[in-house]
Amino acid sequence: MPTVEHFEISADDVERAQKFYKDVFGWTMQKWSERENLGQEYWFFETKDDKGSPGIGGGMMKRQDPSQGITNYVTVSSIDEYSSKIEQSGGKVMVPKTKVSDMGFIAVCLDSENNSFGLFEYAAQSKQ
């Protein structure tokens, strides 16, 4: 069963947002230099529970659109297959399958209630 594996936080002021999440949750962020090749700065971070066990990984970037908030990414075996399922079930694919460096592919969708979420497919799984 596909599961949420990554979430992305959009921020108007990335430094301020990083400080907020560090002060509140202890999350430290590491810049992903490879993403700069796509014309966008991006930071990764890992979450952990109170005992130090790893949680869902996250990322942060500068907000591109006023309506952009937090996006949860569900890892799937095939974005093409799940995009079709989404549309057949009353959802919409807003950003079609897009390559993200050598890691894999993403797509951004809306569910039947207009909530946005992302799909992620590892490159090793992809037939492109």
Q: Where in this protein do the model-derived segments appear?
A:
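Short amphipathic alpha-helical segments
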Residues: 3-7, 56, 68-72, 105
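Short acidic/glycine-enriched loop/turn segments that link adjacent beta-strands
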Residues: 36-41, 66-68, 100-105
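Short hydrophobic/aromatic beta-strand element in the GNAT-like acyltransferase core
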Residues: 42, 57, 106-108
